[in-house]
Amino acid sequence: MSFLDDEKWTGRVFTGSWERAAGGDAAVIEPATGDELGRVGIASPQDLAASAAKAAEAQRAWAATSFQERAAVLRRAGDLWQQHAAELKDWLIRESGSIPGKADFELHVAAQECYEAAALPSHPTGEVLPSEAPRLSMARRVPAGVVGVIAPFNAPLILSIRSVAPALALGNSVVLKPDPRTAVCGGVALARVFEEAGLPAGVLHVLPGGPDVGAALVEDKHVRVISFTGSTAAGRAVGESAGRHLKRAHLELGGNSALIVLDDADLEQAMSAAAWGSFFHQGQICMTTGRHLVHASLYDEYVDRLADKASHLPVGNPFTEQVALGPIIDAKQRDKIHGLVTSSVDAGAKVAAGGTYEDLFYRATVLAGAGPSVPAYDQEVFGPVAPVAKFTSLDEAAKLASESEYGLSLGIITADVAKGLALADRIPTGIAHINDQTVNDEALAPFGGVFDSGTGSRFGGPAANIEAFTETRWVTMRGDVAGYPF
Protein backbone atom coordinates (compact mmCIF):
# COMPACT_ATOMS: atom_id res chain seq x y z
CA MET A 1 0.00 0.00 0.00
CA SER A 2 1.36 3.43 -0.92
CA PHE A 3 1.74 6.20 1.65
CA LEU A 4 -0.90 8.31 -0.13
CA ASP A 5 -3.18 5.38 -0.97
CA ASP A 6 -6.34 7.01 -2.30
CA GLU A 7 -8.56 4.45 -0.59
CA LYS A 8 -7.91 6.39 2.60
CA TRP A 9 -8.72 9.88 1.39
CA THR A 10 -11.05 9.67 -1.62
CA GLY A 11 -14.10 11.80 -0.85
CA ARG A 12 -12.95 12.26 2.75
CA VAL A 13 -11.64 14.94 5.08
CA PHE A 14 -9.28 14.37 7.99
CA THR A 15 -10.49 15.06 11.52
CA GLY A 16 -8.17 12.68 13.33
CA SER A 17 -9.74 9.94 11.24
CA TRP A 18 -10.85 9.92 7.61
CA GLU A 19 -14.52 10.87 7.37
CA ARG A 20 -16.89 11.42 4.47
CA ALA A 21 -17.05 15.09 3.53
CA ALA A 22 -20.45 16.73 3.76
CA GLY A 23 -19.57 18.96 0.81
CA GLY A 24 -19.07 16.02 -1.55
CA ASP A 25 -15.89 15.61 -3.55
CA ALA A 26 -13.94 17.27 -6.34
CA ALA A 27 -11.56 16.06 -9.01
CA VAL A 28 -7.82 16.42 -8.50
CA ILE A 29 -6.65 17.53 -11.95
CA GLU A 30 -3.15 17.26 -13.39
CA PRO A 31 -2.62 20.67 -15.07
CA ALA A 32 -0.16 19.33 -17.63
CA THR A 33 -2.56 16.74 -19.07
CA GLY A 34 -6.04 17.47 -17.75
CA ASP A 35 -6.14 13.94 -16.34
CA GLU A 36 -8.00 13.20 -13.12
CA LEU A 37 -5.61 11.98 -10.40
CA GLY A 38 -8.27 11.28 -7.78
CA ARG A 39 -11.19 12.83 -5.96
CA VAL A 40 -10.62 14.76 -2.76
CA GLY A 41 -13.27 15.39 -0.12
CA ILE A 42 -14.71 18.91 0.02
CA ALA A 43 -15.72 20.18 3.43
CA SER A 44 -18.85 22.14 4.20
CA PRO A 45 -19.15 24.95 6.76
CA GLN A 46 -20.83 22.38 9.00
CA ASP A 47 -17.76 20.13 8.73
CA LEU A 48 -15.65 23.12 9.68
CA ALA A 49 -17.72 23.92 12.76
CA ALA A 50 -17.53 20.33 13.98
CA SER A 51 -13.77 20.18 13.41
CA ALA A 52 -13.10 23.49 15.17
CA ALA A 53 -15.01 22.32 18.25
CA LYS A 54 -13.19 18.99 18.24
CA ALA A 55 -9.84 20.73 17.77
CA ALA A 56 -10.51 22.99 20.77
CA GLU A 57 -11.19 19.97 22.95
CA ALA A 58 -8.13 18.06 21.73
CA GLN A 59 -5.87 21.10 22.13
CA ARG A 60 -6.10 21.15 25.91
CA ALA A 61 -4.72 17.63 26.24
CA TRP A 62 -2.08 18.24 23.57
CA ALA A 63 -0.83 21.40 25.30
CA ALA A 64 -0.55 19.45 28.55
CA THR A 65 1.80 16.84 27.05
CA SER A 66 5.49 17.13 27.84
CA PHE A 67 7.76 19.12 25.58
CA GLN A 68 9.64 15.88 24.84
CA GLU A 69 6.49 14.22 23.49
CA ARG A 70 5.63 17.11 21.20
CA ALA A 71 9.19 17.36 19.96
CA ALA A 72 9.25 13.62 19.21
CA VAL A 73 6.14 13.87 17.03
CA LEU A 74 7.70 16.71 15.01
CA ARG A 75 10.97 14.81 14.59
CA ARG A 76 9.13 11.74 13.34
CA ALA A 77 7.19 13.94 10.92
CA GLY A 78 10.45 15.31 9.54
CA ASP A 79 11.74 11.77 9.02
CA LEU A 80 8.54 10.76 7.21
CA TRP A 81 8.88 13.53 4.63
CA GLN A 82 12.26 12.07 3.75
CA GLN A 83 11.20 8.41 3.88
CA HIS A 84 8.32 8.95 1.45
CA ALA A 85 9.98 11.62 -0.68
CA ALA A 86 9.83 9.69 -3.96
CA GLU A 87 6.05 9.22 -3.85
CA LEU A 88 5.39 12.72 -2.57
CA LYS A 89 7.65 14.20 -5.25
CA ASP A 90 5.56 12.59 -7.99
CA TRP A 91 2.42 14.12 -6.48
CA LEU A 92 3.99 17.58 -6.31
CA ILE A 93 5.01 17.37 -9.96
CA ARG A 94 1.66 16.12 -11.21
CA GLU A 95 -0.79 17.99 -8.98
CA SER A 96 0.89 21.41 -8.81
CA GLY A 97 2.87 21.43 -12.06
CA SER A 98 6.23 21.61 -10.29
CA ILE A 99 9.44 20.77 -12.08
CA PRO A 100 11.35 18.01 -10.20
CA GLY A 101 13.81 20.44 -8.64
CA LYS A 102 11.03 22.54 -7.18
CA ALA A 103 9.35 19.41 -5.80
CA ASP A 104 12.63 18.35 -4.19
CA PHE A 105 12.95 21.80 -2.63
CA GLU A 106 9.45 21.68 -1.16
CA LEU A 107 10.13 18.30 0.43
CA HIS A 108 13.46 19.51 1.81
CA VAL A 109 11.80 22.55 3.36
CA ALA A 110 8.94 20.44 4.75
CA ALA A 111 11.39 18.20 6.59
CA GLN A 112 13.40 21.18 7.82
CA GLU A 113 10.27 22.97 9.05
CA CYS A 114 9.43 19.93 11.16
CA TYR A 115 12.95 19.55 12.52
CA GLU A 116 13.14 23.24 13.39
CA ALA A 117 9.68 23.07 14.96
CA ALA A 118 10.82 20.12 17.07
CA ALA A 119 13.15 22.53 18.90
CA LEU A 120 10.33 24.94 19.79
CA PRO A 121 8.76 22.98 22.69
CA SER A 122 12.03 23.20 24.64
CA HIS A 123 12.89 26.72 23.51
CA PRO A 124 13.19 28.98 26.57
CA THR A 125 10.45 31.59 26.48
CA GLY A 126 9.13 34.20 28.87
CA GLU A 127 10.63 36.72 31.24
CA VAL A 128 11.06 37.26 34.95
CA LEU A 129 9.82 40.79 35.63
CA PRO A 130 10.60 43.26 38.39
CA SER A 131 7.63 43.84 40.68
CA GLU A 132 6.61 46.57 43.09
CA ALA A 133 5.20 43.92 45.44
CA PRO A 134 7.07 41.13 47.31
CA ARG A 135 6.29 38.47 44.73
CA LEU A 136 7.65 36.61 41.73
CA SER A 137 6.37 38.22 38.53
CA MET A 138 6.66 36.48 35.16
CA ALA A 139 5.56 36.87 31.55
CA ARG A 140 4.95 33.40 30.11
CA ARG A 141 4.19 32.21 26.61
CA VAL A 142 1.18 29.90 26.36
CA PRO A 143 -0.45 28.25 23.31
CA ALA A 144 -2.92 30.41 21.41
CA GLY A 145 -5.43 27.54 21.18
CA VAL A 146 -6.86 26.56 17.79
CA VAL A 147 -4.92 27.91 14.79
CA GLY A 148 -6.63 28.15 11.41
CA VAL A 149 -4.35 27.81 8.40
CA ILE A 150 -5.45 28.75 4.87
CA ALA A 151 -2.90 27.78 2.21
CA PRO A 152 -2.69 28.40 -1.57
CA PHE A 153 -1.90 26.23 -4.60
CA ASN A 154 1.49 27.46 -5.76
CA ALA A 155 3.82 25.90 -3.17
CA PRO A 156 1.19 23.79 -1.44
CA LEU A 157 3.45 21.81 0.86
CA ILE A 158 5.72 24.62 2.05
CA LEU A 159 2.92 27.12 2.52
CA SER A 160 0.95 24.68 4.67
CA ILE A 161 3.71 23.11 6.75
CA ARG A 162 5.42 26.39 7.65
CA SER A 163 2.40 27.26 9.83
CA VAL A 164 1.16 23.79 10.76
CA ALA A 165 4.45 22.48 12.16
CA PRO A 166 5.33 25.35 14.54
CA ALA A 167 1.72 25.78 15.63
CA LEU A 168 1.53 22.11 16.63
CA ALA A 169 4.95 22.16 18.29
CA LEU A 170 3.90 25.07 20.51
CA GLY A 171 0.88 23.20 21.86
CA ASN A 172 -1.87 24.39 19.54
CA SER A 173 -4.31 22.36 17.51
CA VAL A 174 -4.69 23.20 13.82
CA VAL A 175 -7.50 23.32 11.29
CA LEU A 176 -5.96 23.45 7.81
CA LYS A 177 -7.87 24.49 4.69
CA PRO A 178 -5.74 23.78 1.61
CA ASP A 179 -6.60 25.02 -1.86
CA PRO A 180 -8.85 22.37 -3.49
CA ARG A 181 -6.66 22.44 -6.62
CA THR A 182 -3.69 21.09 -4.64
CA ALA A 183 -5.46 19.47 -1.72
CA VAL A 184 -3.38 16.29 -1.81
CA CYS A 185 0.06 17.93 -1.56
CA GLY A 186 -1.19 20.81 0.58
CA GLY A 187 -3.46 18.82 2.87
CA VAL A 188 -3.76 15.05 2.54
CA ALA A 189 0.03 14.62 2.66
CA LEU A 190 0.25 16.55 5.94
CA ALA A 191 -2.58 14.55 7.45
CA ARG A 192 -0.87 11.27 6.54
CA VAL A 193 2.52 12.40 7.85
CA PHE A 194 1.21 13.51 11.23
CA GLU A 195 -1.10 10.51 11.46
CA GLU A 196 1.91 8.22 11.05
CA ALA A 197 4.06 10.40 13.32
CA GLY A 198 1.74 9.72 16.26
CA LEU A 199 -0.04 13.05 16.61
CA PRO A 200 -3.09 12.47 18.84
CA ALA A 201 -6.42 12.31 17.03
CA GLY A 202 -8.25 15.61 16.78
CA VAL A 203 -5.19 17.85 17.06
CA LEU A 204 -4.91 18.31 13.27
CA HIS A 205 -7.85 18.65 10.90
CA VAL A 206 -7.54 18.93 7.11
CA LEU A 207 -10.59 20.35 5.33
CA PRO A 208 -10.27 21.25 1.64
CA GLY A 209 -12.99 23.66 0.66
CA GLY A 210 -14.04 26.83 -1.05
CA PRO A 211 -14.45 30.42 0.12
CA ASP A 212 -17.42 29.50 2.33
CA VAL A 213 -15.25 27.13 4.36
CA GLY A 214 -12.48 29.72 4.59
CA ALA A 215 -14.96 32.31 5.84
CA ALA A 216 -16.34 29.86 8.40
CA LEU A 217 -12.81 29.12 9.62
CA VAL A 218 -12.06 32.80 10.21
CA GLU A 219 -15.40 33.39 11.94
CA ASP A 220 -15.49 30.30 14.16
CA LYS A 221 -15.39 31.14 17.87
CA HIS A 222 -13.00 28.28 18.68
CA VAL A 223 -10.31 29.52 16.28
CA ARG A 224 -8.07 32.14 17.89
CA VAL A 225 -5.37 32.75 15.27
CA ILE A 226 -5.53 32.74 11.47
CA SER A 227 -2.47 32.12 9.31
CA PHE A 228 -3.33 33.01 5.72
CA THR A 229 -1.25 32.87 2.56
CA GLY A 230 -2.83 34.03 -0.67
CA SER A 231 -3.80 37.02 -2.75
CA THR A 232 -3.96 40.53 -1.35
CA ALA A 233 -7.66 40.81 -2.20
CA ALA A 234 -8.52 37.63 -0.31
CA GLY A 235 -6.18 38.63 2.52
CA ARG A 236 -8.02 41.91 3.00
CA ALA A 237 -11.28 40.01 3.43
CA VAL A 238 -9.65 37.62 5.90
CA GLY A 239 -8.13 40.49 7.87
CA GLU A 240 -11.40 42.41 7.99
CA SER A 241 -13.32 39.36 9.22
CA ALA A 242 -10.64 38.49 11.78
CA GLY A 243 -10.76 42.06 13.09
CA ARG A 244 -14.53 41.91 13.50
CA HIS A 245 -14.16 38.68 15.45
CA LEU A 246 -11.27 40.00 17.55
CA LYS A 247 -8.67 37.44 16.56
CA ARG A 248 -5.17 37.74 15.19
CA ALA A 249 -4.52 37.24 11.49
CA HIS A 250 -1.06 36.66 10.05
CA LEU A 251 -1.29 37.58 6.37
CA GLU A 252 1.33 36.69 3.74
CA LEU A 253 -0.01 38.17 0.52
CA GLY A 254 1.01 39.21 -2.98
CA GLY A 255 4.14 40.81 -4.32
CA ASN A 256 5.69 42.56 -7.29
CA SER A 257 9.32 42.32 -6.33
CA ALA A 258 12.09 44.28 -8.01
CA LEU A 259 15.51 43.08 -9.11
CA ILE A 260 17.85 46.08 -9.47
CA VAL A 261 20.89 45.66 -11.70
CA LEU A 262 23.49 48.38 -11.07
CA ASP A 263 25.93 49.68 -13.66
CA ASP A 264 28.84 47.67 -12.22
CA ALA A 265 27.02 44.33 -12.45
CA ASP A 266 28.49 41.35 -14.30
CA LEU A 267 25.69 40.46 -16.74
CA GLU A 268 27.08 36.99 -17.37
CA GLN A 269 26.57 36.21 -13.70
CA ALA A 270 23.34 38.17 -13.41
CA MET A 271 21.45 36.32 -16.16
CA SER A 272 20.98 33.06 -14.28
CA ALA A 273 19.61 34.87 -11.24
CA ALA A 274 17.40 37.13 -13.35
CA ALA A 275 15.81 34.26 -15.26
CA TRP A 276 15.33 32.16 -12.14
CA GLY A 277 13.68 35.05 -10.33
CA SER A 278 11.01 35.53 -13.01
CA PHE A 279 10.52 32.06 -14.49
CA PHE A 280 10.94 29.57 -11.61
CA HIS A 281 7.70 27.61 -11.18
CA GLN A 282 6.23 29.52 -14.09
CA GLY A 283 6.38 32.73 -12.05
CA GLN A 284 3.69 31.42 -9.71
CA ILE A 285 5.45 32.53 -6.52
CA CYS A 286 4.71 35.55 -4.35
CA MET A 287 8.42 36.51 -4.36
CA THR A 288 8.78 36.26 -8.16
CA THR A 289 10.83 39.01 -9.77
CA GLY A 290 8.03 41.07 -11.28
CA ARG A 291 10.15 44.11 -12.20
CA HIS A 292 13.67 44.17 -13.63
CA LEU A 293 15.20 47.61 -13.05
CA VAL A 294 18.40 47.88 -15.09
CA HIS A 295 20.90 50.73 -15.39
CA ALA A 296 20.58 52.45 -18.76
CA SER A 297 24.18 51.63 -19.69
CA LEU A 298 23.41 47.89 -19.49
CA TYR A 299 19.78 47.93 -20.53
CA ASP A 300 19.91 46.85 -24.20
CA GLU A 301 22.41 44.07 -23.57
CA TYR A 302 20.42 42.91 -20.53
CA VAL A 303 17.18 42.67 -22.53
CA ASP A 304 18.92 40.79 -25.35
CA ARG A 305 20.60 38.32 -22.98
CA LEU A 306 17.45 37.71 -20.93
CA ALA A 307 15.34 37.26 -24.06
CA ASP A 308 17.86 34.77 -25.44
CA LYS A 309 17.82 32.80 -22.20
CA ALA A 310 14.01 32.87 -22.04
CA SER A 311 13.67 31.63 -25.61
CA HIS A 312 15.81 28.59 -24.81
CA LEU A 313 13.94 27.50 -21.67
CA PRO A 314 11.95 24.34 -22.52
CA VAL A 315 8.28 24.26 -21.52
CA GLY A 316 6.24 21.09 -21.10
CA ASN A 317 5.02 18.29 -18.86
CA PRO A 318 7.50 18.09 -15.96
CA PHE A 319 6.44 14.52 -15.14
CA THR A 320 7.41 13.10 -18.54
CA GLU A 321 9.90 15.62 -19.98
CA GLN A 322 13.03 17.48 -18.90
CA VAL A 323 11.72 21.03 -18.84
CA ALA A 324 12.43 24.34 -17.13
CA LEU A 325 8.79 25.45 -16.98
CA GLY A 326 5.73 23.34 -16.33
CA PRO A 327 2.06 24.25 -16.70
CA ILE A 328 0.11 27.17 -15.28
CA ILE A 329 -2.28 25.88 -12.61
CA ASP A 330 -5.48 26.40 -14.66
CA ALA A 331 -6.98 28.22 -17.64
CA LYS A 332 -8.28 31.12 -15.56
CA GLN A 333 -4.78 31.95 -14.34
CA ARG A 334 -3.30 31.49 -17.81
CA ASP A 335 -5.84 33.89 -19.29
CA LYS A 336 -5.06 36.47 -16.61
CA ILE A 337 -1.35 36.25 -17.47
CA HIS A 338 -1.95 36.60 -21.18
CA GLY A 339 -4.33 39.49 -20.64
CA LEU A 340 -1.65 41.39 -18.75
CA VAL A 341 0.90 40.69 -21.48
CA THR A 342 -1.38 41.88 -24.29
CA SER A 343 -2.51 44.97 -22.39
CA SER A 344 1.15 45.77 -21.68
CA VAL A 345 1.91 45.64 -25.39
CA ASP A 346 -1.03 47.95 -25.97
CA ALA A 347 0.54 50.30 -23.40
CA GLY A 348 3.83 50.44 -25.30
CA ALA A 349 5.88 47.47 -24.08
CA LYS A 350 7.59 45.21 -26.61
CA VAL A 351 7.65 41.41 -26.46
CA ALA A 352 11.34 40.48 -26.65
CA ALA A 353 10.65 36.78 -26.01
CA GLY A 354 7.64 34.56 -25.39
CA GLY A 355 4.19 36.01 -25.07
CA THR A 356 2.57 32.83 -26.42
CA TYR A 357 1.08 29.67 -24.95
CA GLU A 358 -0.26 26.25 -25.84
CA ASP A 359 -2.87 24.74 -23.53
CA LEU A 360 -1.62 25.65 -20.03
CA PHE A 361 2.02 25.96 -21.08
CA TYR A 362 3.03 29.64 -21.17
CA ARG A 363 6.42 30.44 -22.60
CA ALA A 364 8.95 32.48 -20.62
CA THR A 365 8.23 36.08 -21.60
CA VAL A 366 10.40 39.20 -21.60
CA LEU A 367 8.78 42.63 -21.98
CA ALA A 368 11.13 45.45 -22.99
CA GLY A 369 10.17 49.09 -22.60
CA ALA A 370 8.26 48.45 -19.39
CA GLY A 371 7.75 50.94 -16.60
CA PRO A 372 5.01 52.69 -14.65
CA SER A 373 1.61 52.54 -16.41
CA VAL A 374 2.48 49.22 -18.11
CA PRO A 375 0.07 46.66 -16.55
CA ALA A 376 2.53 43.76 -16.26
CA TYR A 377 4.98 46.12 -14.53
CA ASP A 378 2.45 47.70 -12.18
CA GLN A 379 0.56 44.55 -11.19
CA GLU A 380 1.39 41.11 -9.83
CA VAL A 381 1.29 38.83 -12.89
CA PHE A 382 1.80 35.45 -11.17
CA GLY A 383 3.19 34.04 -14.38
CA PRO A 384 6.51 33.70 -16.26
CA VAL A 385 6.76 37.33 -17.34
CA ALA A 386 9.80 39.60 -16.91
CA PRO A 387 9.07 43.31 -17.50
CA VAL A 388 12.33 45.27 -17.90
CA ALA A 389 12.63 49.01 -17.16
CA LYS A 390 15.67 51.30 -17.08
CA PHE A 391 17.06 53.83 -14.62
CA THR A 392 19.94 56.30 -14.75
CA SER A 393 20.81 56.91 -11.08
CA LEU A 394 20.62 55.27 -7.67
CA ASP A 395 17.98 57.79 -6.65
CA GLU A 396 15.82 56.83 -9.62
CA ALA A 397 16.33 53.12 -8.92
CA ALA A 398 15.25 53.55 -5.30
CA LYS A 399 12.24 55.61 -6.38
CA LEU A 400 11.09 53.11 -9.00
CA ALA A 401 11.54 50.12 -6.70
CA SER A 402 9.61 51.85 -3.91
CA GLU A 403 6.72 52.93 -6.13
CA SER A 404 4.68 49.79 -5.59
CA GLU A 405 1.73 48.90 -3.42
CA TYR A 406 3.66 45.77 -2.48
CA GLY A 407 6.73 45.33 -0.31
CA LEU A 408 7.75 41.68 -0.18
CA SER A 409 11.19 40.93 -1.62
CA LEU A 410 14.07 42.80 -3.27
CA GLY A 411 17.20 41.75 -5.12
CA ILE A 412 20.20 43.91 -6.03
CA ILE A 413 23.03 42.84 -8.36
CA THR A 414 26.24 44.83 -7.95
CA ALA A 415 30.02 44.49 -7.66
CA ASP A 416 29.91 46.80 -4.63
CA VAL A 417 28.18 45.00 -1.76
CA ALA A 418 28.22 48.03 0.52
CA LYS A 419 26.54 50.14 -2.16
CA GLY A 420 23.95 47.42 -2.65
CA LEU A 421 23.13 47.26 1.05
CA ALA A 422 22.87 51.04 1.28
CA LEU A 423 20.43 51.02 -1.64
CA ALA A 424 18.39 48.21 -0.09
CA ASP A 425 18.01 50.26 3.09
CA ARG A 426 16.20 52.93 1.06
CA ILE A 427 13.55 50.52 -0.27
CA PRO A 428 10.85 49.23 2.12
CA THR A 429 10.48 45.45 1.79
CA GLY A 430 10.28 42.55 4.21
CA ILE A 431 13.15 40.73 2.47
CA ALA A 432 16.28 41.96 0.67
CA HIS A 433 19.06 40.01 -1.06
CA ILE A 434 22.33 41.52 -2.27
CA ASN A 435 23.71 39.67 -5.30
CA ASP A 436 20.78 37.31 -5.49
CA GLN A 437 17.33 37.30 -7.04
CA THR A 438 14.08 37.69 -5.12
CA VAL A 439 12.94 34.06 -4.67
CA ASN A 440 14.54 32.62 -1.53
CA ASP A 441 13.19 30.67 1.43
CA GLU A 442 14.73 28.97 4.48
CA ALA A 443 12.97 27.43 7.46
CA LEU A 444 15.06 29.49 9.92
CA ALA A 445 14.68 32.85 8.19
CA PRO A 446 11.89 35.34 9.01
CA PHE A 447 9.56 35.69 6.06
CA GLY A 448 6.94 38.32 5.30
CA GLY A 449 6.26 41.62 3.62
CA VAL A 450 4.99 45.13 4.23
CA PHE A 451 2.24 47.26 2.71
CA ASP A 452 -0.06 45.15 0.50
CA SER A 453 2.28 42.17 0.82
CA GLY A 454 1.06 41.39 4.33
CA THR A 455 1.49 41.98 8.00
CA GLY A 456 5.22 41.44 8.37
CA SER A 457 7.57 38.56 9.20
CA ARG A 458 5.31 36.04 10.87
CA PHE A 459 6.87 32.90 9.44
CA GLY A 460 10.30 31.37 9.92
CA GLY A 461 12.61 31.07 12.90
CA PRO A 462 11.79 30.65 16.59
CA ALA A 463 11.12 34.32 17.36
CA ALA A 464 8.54 34.76 14.58
CA ASN A 465 6.86 31.42 15.25
CA ILE A 466 6.59 31.95 19.00
CA GLU A 467 5.17 35.42 18.42
CA ALA A 468 2.70 34.07 15.85
CA PHE A 469 1.32 31.05 17.66
CA THR A 470 1.40 31.85 21.38
CA GLU A 471 -0.09 34.40 23.76
CA THR A 472 1.71 36.24 26.55
CA ARG A 473 0.35 35.60 30.04
CA TRP A 474 1.32 37.56 33.16
CA VAL A 475 1.72 35.32 36.22
CA THR A 476 2.60 36.34 39.79
CA MET A 477 3.31 34.18 42.85
CA ARG A 478 3.86 34.99 46.52
CA GLY A 479 4.12 32.90 49.67
CA ASP A 480 1.42 34.68 51.66
CA VAL A 481 -1.95 36.07 50.66
CA ALA A 482 -1.80 39.74 49.75
CA GLY A 483 -3.61 42.08 52.15
CA TYR A 484 -5.71 45.09 51.08
CA PRO A 485 -7.40 47.94 53.01
CA PHE A 486 -10.91 46.52 52.49
Swiss-Prot record:
What reaction does this catalyse? vanillin + NAD(+) + H2O = vanillate + NADH + 2 H(+)
Q: Where does NAD(+) bind?
A: 210-211, 230-231, 252-254, 380-382
CDD domains with a match to the protein in the record: ALDH_BenzADH
Alphabetically list the UniProt keywords. NAD, Oxidoreductase
Its induction note reads: By vanillin and ferulic acid.
Q: What class of enzyme is it?
A: oxidoreductase
Tell me its EC number(s), please: 1.2.1.67
| Annotated family | Belongs to the aldehyde dehydrogenase family.
Q: What is this protein called?
A: Vanillin dehydrogenase
Provide the taxonomic classification: Bacteria, Bacillati, Actinomycetota, Actinomycetes, Pseudonocardiales
